[in-house]
Amino acid sequence: MVDLEAAVEAVHRAESAVAQHDWFRAWGPVLTALFIAERGFLAGEDAAWISEIRNQLTVLRLRALECYAATELGIAGTELAGAVRAGQQLIQLAPLRESGYRYLMNALAAQDNLAEALAIYSQLCDTLREQLGVSPSPATRELYQQLLAAT
């Protein structure tokens, strides 16, 4: 439980730093949170309290991946590949959570892979339409329009 508490504290510090665009201050705490959240918890065991801890770790991992993607985008340069990986992981873990798609689209566009970024938007549209019958949020549509304008 100590690790979970440390990870919660670390992701909170990382989120605060990201909100202030202090990418280098976010770096250490976000890595701590990711390392803890990705470890898993009592593999092979099954109890209600274990499931609750696993759910908390999953939510924590999503928050940490979002912070990591934002931090990598903020640092830019050679760190953009990390933002791409984080966006891909977010999409895999939570395919209906649009933030992962936006991080991935931004990272790909920053790497001059604009067509690939636009294809990610199309993938999101298909997923949302098939699963929920809805369109992307205004924030995601706005990012798509910005990327289109850059072509």
Which residue stretches match the model-derived regions?
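Intrinsically disordered, charged and Pro/Gly-enriched terminal/linker segments
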Residues: 1-151
